[in-house]
């Protein structure tokens, strides 16, 4: 039976009030892992150690498994403890009517985001920034300016303000609202100081409540041509605060960036199972949120990193599959184990940039160095590496890319437990001139040389 109308966030809210009852433990510990395991077996999924897939038939099976995961499981609402189900026609309606391209930013700083494919010769868009990492109030502008000064960077992804007017931005407090507005206002000033006043940003990152996120759309703050973030919950879950934010974004005609980081080794399970959930999550972004693009980020449950062998494989297969069988636009976010000013951090980011570029990602978003959890440990140099490596990777043969990745990951994967902490922005840069130290430049050159030895041509 055909659907009455295209599905939207208001339909989601209504169904979240009347859907099938389920405890969160049953959802997390039974429904998600059992269905993912069942679908892996049903479709015979085996990625055979490839980072970026070369088997189109296996990719098609993965797409079918991800579609079926979303159709049969639905989405769990954590507020009502009910399951929201879509019909098959509603899902296809969303897939068939996605935004095929959009513009971020204004004036000469605007960039056009268009679909890429596996092995595409065009470099993806580089969204450089702290990626939700905590940043001190006193260096908030120079940290973001360090990204805007890099020509490899096309747009900015915001950091989190640890304080505003010296006070913590407690959720649902006046300070959260102020921080949500101030976050983007300061970043746009930083971009203007770098000579790029029309650069788009992606956020807000500081606020955790619906009122905080909605308040970020303001004079001098988030504009409709910026990427507006809303986050799904692990795995295939959402709360009603997020649905309210989605309603605002759609009513405001904002570019919507639907974000979620599937956890390898978590509720979904292993590599293939987590990738099935990742594909389902991609599709849900466009059904539930009416997203302009989906920001991915498979993360390792033990290491908290997106750059491990397992998470790179999940990211590569999920993106290549989405790229091959839909027009949905996808990005990926970067969380290395090592901190800034270290060779390991740059190599980790490079491995993910190679994977994302080769598998058809439209947007690379990072780098949240030191796992994105240490204050002020992120700089524009990591984003430069992400961009330069993407440029070197674009158009390369996938079989060669997989060989390079195997060797590259082997250089750092034994060091996760003892990853170098690195240095803060203040130690990596001259804060007044917003330029990297000679020491960091030498480390950067050393990492670049290693990548050249592995086969990348800059």
Curated annotation (Swiss-Prot):
Family: Belongs to the monomethylamine methyltransferase family.
This protein's name: Monomethylamine methyltransferase MtmB2
Enzyme class: transferase
Record's subunit section: Can form a complex with MtmC.
Gene3D superfamilies: Monomethylamine methyltransferase MtmB (3.20.20.460)
Keywords for this protein: Methanogenesis, Methyltransferase, Pyrrolysine, Transferase
GO biological process: methanogenesis; methylation
Pathway this chain belongs to: One-carbon metabolism; methanogenesis from methylamine
EC number: 2.1.1.248
Keyword presence, Transferase: yes
Coiled-coil annotated residue ranges, if any: none
Described function: Catalyzes the transfer of the methyl group from monomethylamine to the corrinoid cofactor of MtmC.
